[in-house]
Amino acid sequence: MSEKYHSTVTRRDFMKRLGLAGAGAGALGAAVLAENNLPHEFKDVDDLLSAGKALEGDHANKVNNHPWWVTTRDHEDPTCNIDWSLIKRYSGWNNQGAYFLPEDYLSPTYTGRRHTIVDSKLEIELQGKKYRDSAFIKSGIDWMKENIDPDYDPGELGYGDRREDALIYAATNGSHNCWENPLYGRYEGSRPYLSMRTMNGINGLHEFGHADIKTTNYPKWEGTPEENLLIMRTAARYFGASSVGAIKITDNVKKIFYAKVQPFCLGPWYTITNMAEYIEYPVPVDNYAIPIVFEDIPADQGHYSYKRFGGDDKIAVPNALDNIFTYTIMLPEKRFKYAHSIPMDPCSCIAYPLFTEVEARIQQFIAGLGYNSMGGGVEAWGPGSAFGNLSGLGEQSRVSSIIEPRYGSNTKGSLRMLTDLPLAPTKPIDAGIREFCKTCGICAEHCPTQAISHEGPRYDSPHWDCVSGYEGWHLDYHKCINCTICEAVCPFFTMSNNSWVHNLVKSTVATTPVFNGFFKNMEGAFGYGPRYSPSRDEWWASENPIRGASVDIF
């Protein structure tokens, strides 16, 4: 669709329709133009983009090479206004609900049940239903039949034909560092799943015979915080990350850490189904959450432990680990157009085992520099969007997760790693994304279960498992079915390909929000984002980019 649009509307005509032809100061700001000795009037879009190149980096976190129209704000002051006096640590957030369900949630007399994923796990594990007949999967199947293909065949598991089943089976293996144990049943006490990760290091993923680099006696790396951030960016992107950032742990930042978590376990169903009993961890995990405690202990002594295994029921975080390194993982953009495996399509869930791999390599890289770190994956420490927002990876969106100016909604993670490696903190950004979300709402219109708010941002959360105290949107995680539709229909999804029109749209969104309604309508008319294809075979016959990610946006 975008090709047709590009071929029938000239740059000059497009500028006229925007009211930007012959414009300058109104679009970019007279002060910025004057400060950089740039003209106050632009004849066409090329003039506008040339001016942007001249401003490149002046108003952005240079570590991510944000374009000129991305500005930075003060530390701890993102575009979703925060009243830090209202922010309190709370227990058990994760991206599908809470670790702590209401006490009577499992009672047959409970009337407020709406957590479709937990209920589906109960249906599958305890009631013996087929996976595709559970509420979680069935809601996605119904949406596909009503909106995409009336003859949609969900297959045996609800994801599609046998190829789709095989793809999601392979794509999800390793999620949250839970791999199928190839030695299960071959020795006494073996468990079906295997984890190599602890919260203060990686026990696996190294070359056999290579000495533990932390045991060597040569001096550790010494660099400035700015140099360290740049080498971390280079290493993280080499391992598979996209954007990166850093935050200093202050008293305010500590407020966004969970009060309690269950290490490495994502979701209340892990407790309901005793999932921790099926996983071999280097340090055992029990079936309940334990508090995160900041302590004055050596930087290499961070740990978690449970009383049942001789520990002290806490996650101990050394105060010496006073920096947070944040990063995201880019998703396979092309696959979204063919996301027939709703919910939990491989285009989204492939990110979770990648989190494990990238985190492992980053932790070992930090160890190789002579420093310490504590990871924990996507479910660790606190809500990812908060860390991503504060470190300038992106802005909070209507769907609650962040949208990045460079990669749009096509990332996952806002992953966070604690370390004593000195890092220069990156600032929150303003790319006009939050303001655009106020007038857009396409994601809410298309959400199959209406988990996304149609209202404006608010300080108080209407849901018991979301934190209050920031002026933003609060996703109803109880209704979310992991369908990826909100990501695919977002106008920012494919605005990352460096075409002139996408850069113009994004720069105008950032500098002239009066056009936001126009761009929202233009998305509906021209369809920037991918649209679902009813053809099952087209994606399988296509030549995909490496790891499915477009290479032209790097």
From Swiss-Prot:
**What does the UniProt entry say about where the protein is found?**
Cell membrane
Q: What class of enzyme is it?
A: oxidoreductase
Residue positions annotated to bind [4Fe-4S] cluster 2 are: 447, 480, 483, 486
Signal sequence: where?
1-42
Q: Does the keyword Repeat apply?
A: yes
Domain 4Fe-4S ferredoxin-type positions: 425-457, 471-500
GO molecular function term, any single one:
oxidoreductase activity
How does the cofactor attach, per the note?
Binds 2 [4Fe-4S] clusters.
Task: For this UniProt record, give its keywords in alphabetical order, as a comma-separated list.
Answer: 4Fe-4S, Cell membrane, Iron, Iron-sulfur, Membrane, Metal-binding, Oxidoreductase, Repeat, Signal
Q: Which reaction does it catalyse?
A: trichloroethene + AH2 = (Z)-1,2-dichloroethene + chloride + A + H(+); (Z)-1,2-dichloroethene + AH2 = chloroethene + chloride + A + H(+); 1,1-dichloroethene + AH2 = chloroethene + chloride + A + H(+)
Q: What does the record give as cofactor?
A: [4Fe-4S] cluster; corrinoid
Gene3D superfamilies assigned to the protein according to its UniProt record, in alphabetical order: 3.30.70.20
Entry PTM: Predicted to be exported by the Tat system. The position of the signal peptide cleavage has been experimentally proven.
Q: What is its EC number?
A: 1.21.99.-
Activity modulation comment? Loses 93% of its activity upon incubation with 1-iodopropane and titanium(III) citrate in the dark. Subsequent exposure to light restores 80% of the original activity. Completely inhibited by 2 mM sodium sulfite or sodium dithionite, and by 1 mM cuprous chloride.
Q: Which family does it belong to?
A: Belongs to the PceA family.
**What is the protein's given name?**
Trichloroethene reductive dehalogenase
Q: Which organism is it from?
A: Dehalococcoides mccartyi (strain ATCC BAA-2266 / KCTC 15142 / 195) (Dehalococcoides ethenogenes (strain 195))
Taxonomic path: Bacteria, Bacillati, Chloroflexota, Dehalococcoidia, Dehalococcoidales
